[in-house]
């Protein structure tokens, strides 16, 4: 997907603010912030030794394969927000242990309670329970790897001007959307394998 295609898709489905969290890179999000006609929240989905974590409102890329604690510390050093994505999606190898939740939860800002690519409704239920247990705002993510997936999950929330207002607005937000077609995961997996082989 090109950045221009992503912008066109967002405009088509009525998205007026977009959080971008590519795997282990911030480059696309920062470039998108320069060219998009709507607000962009730059993020990075970072693979740690304990699982994945997302940093939002970042300005510098954070390396992968650090510990969860080290990664969270680097997000906070940039005054970013820490989001736990798809915490109970057991089809992903990146889900970390429950014990890790307890260790980092004081520094977590957001729990992704609905991920459009998570095939099990039970994973969303448990994620909601986790957010309530710790009093964290819940978010939703399309986790889009293909254009048609953009907008499958979103949050209707009041406008905001900065990171702190974003968190307050998110707490008042309404999660909307539907699960992606399971074939979307097959398509993105195939595309990833093609890149490796070429």
Identify what each model region corresponds to.
Residues 6-24, 80-83:
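Divalent metal-dependent hydrolysis catalytic cores, especially in the metallo-beta-lactamase
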Residues 21, 44, 85, 142:
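Active-site flanking residues adjacent to catalytic metal/cofactor-binding acidic residues
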Residues 1-8, 27-42, 48-66, 70-73, ...:
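Charged catalytic cores and adjacent phosphate/nucleic-acid-binding surfaces used
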Residues 63, 73-80, 84:
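Core dinuclear metal-dependent hydrolase active-site scaffold
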């Amino acid at each position: 997907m090109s950045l221009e295609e992503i912008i066109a898709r967002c405009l088509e489905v009525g998205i007026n603010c977009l959080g971008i969290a590519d795997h282990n890179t911030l480059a696309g999000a920062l470039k998108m912030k320069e060219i998009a006609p709507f607000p962009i929240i730059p993020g990075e989905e970072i693979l740690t030794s304990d699982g994945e974590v997302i940093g939002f409102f970042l300005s510098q890329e954070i390396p992968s394969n650090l510990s969860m604690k080290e990664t969270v510390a680097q997000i906070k050093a940039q005054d970013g927000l820490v989001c736990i994505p798809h915490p109970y999606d057991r089809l992903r190898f990146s889900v970390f242990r429950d014990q890790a939740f307890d260790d980092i939860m004081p520094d977590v800002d957001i729990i992704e309670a609905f991920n459009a690519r998570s095939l099990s409704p039970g994973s969303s239920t448990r994620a909601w329970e986790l957010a309530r247990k710790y009093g964290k705002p819940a978010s939703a993510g399309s986790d889009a790897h293909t254009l048609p997936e953009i907008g499958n999950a979103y949050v209707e929330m009041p406008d905001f001007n900065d990171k702190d207002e974003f968190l307050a607005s998110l707490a008042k937000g309404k999660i909307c959307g539907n699960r992606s077609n399971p074939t979307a995961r097959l398509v993105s997996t195939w595309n990833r394998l093609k890149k490796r082989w070429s």
